[in-house]
Amino acid sequence: MREKWVRAFAGVFCAMLLIGCSKSDRPQMGNAGGAEGGDFVVGMVTDSGDIDDKSFNQQVWEGISRFAQENNAKCKYVTASTDAEYVPSLSAFADENMGLVVACGSFLVEAVIETSARFPKQKFLVIDAVVQDRDNVVSAVFGQNEGSFLVGVAAALKAKEAGKSAVGFIVGMELGMMPLFEAGFEAGVKAVDPDIQVVVEVANTFSDPQKGQALAAKLYDSGVNVIFQVAGGTGNGVIKEARDRRLNGQDVWVIGVDRDQYMDGVYDGSKSVVLTSMVKRADVAAERISKMAYDGSFPGGQSIMFGLEDKAVGIPEENPNLSSAVMEKIRSFEEKIVSKEIVVPVRSARMMN
């Protein structure tokens, strides 16, 4: 995969950052890694959920673990449960002189800014957010607006096939990079049919499957037949609602996020309610930059964009629920995005108002 070094996007991304959260559990710690005796250690701090959330955190952990296994290194993680625990969690790893400390998501931006100033020799990686003007911090961001455009095309085509005039979008929280998903999804939908509406629901949490299921029920009851969920653990509830309704004979679909969630939607043999997924290779970013830190080529102070032309975002290689005609349409749009014939927006119409 090829990475593009970009500073132009940093200002846009930073303008999106909204910091803050509220969680209730105490930090949970764990470890994994290569053979005993490895001196290089990567420490990962999550901002919501755990490393088995079937979404973003799990992807990052898989990338770090893969790096550790291949380089005789080790890795540890801590789940910081409140904003008050972010700085202590990062600082605890920095006190151990980690080879790299990885912060997952935009909740941790302010904590990374503070901690990186206190520990100028410690290398930090913040994933899916931007920290500027810190020589010991690398920011990995993704063109999820580009990947979301493609699943927007799939959603709109499925809606038109069913005679529907709207599709659904459920987001965990409107912060950090999250607006990019809605912007790209809406643009993809409108590229197919400008008259199809995107109905948005905000869960205000990434870790409440029951809330996700309730919001999905609301959208499906309104007549929507396809929902794109971008909500971490909350999104698992969206998938569950789709599975339950399919078992009751309703023709509804859900679009996964971050990784291929087809298997999460299986409800009858090998049948799945997951139409497709907006895959974001956070694991590749985590593995790649961990290796750079290990090799002594850590690009401190840089923001690295992983986009569609890098094959870091997009749809899975296999899409059993998409016809060849739909795939052909999606690939056509993909080529236009990569060639810059189509420039995908970073804000939706709703966000612009």
Curated annotation (Swiss-Prot):
Adenosine binds at D47, S48, F56, D128, F206, G232, D258, K280. Inosine binds at D47, N57, D128, G232, D258, K280. Its main location: membrane. A lipid is attached at C21 (N-palmitoyl cysteine). Binds purine nucleosides and may play a role in purine nucleoside uptake. May be part of an ABC-type nucleoside uptake system. Has highest affinity for guanosine, followed by inosine and adenosine. Has very low affinity for cytidine and does not bind thymidine. The gene is tmpC. It comes from Treponema pallidum (strain Nichols). Belongs to the BMP lipoprotein family. It is a lipid-anchor. Keywords: Cell membrane, Lipoprotein, Membrane, Palmitate, Signal, Transport. This is Membrane lipoprotein TmpC. Induction: Encoded in an operon with TP_0320, TP_0321, TP_0322 and TP_0323 that may code for an ABC-type nucleoside uptake system, with TP_0322 and/or TP_0323 encoding putative permeases, and TP_0319 encoding a ligand-binding protein. GO terms for cellular component: plasma membrane. Residues 1-20 form the signal peptide.
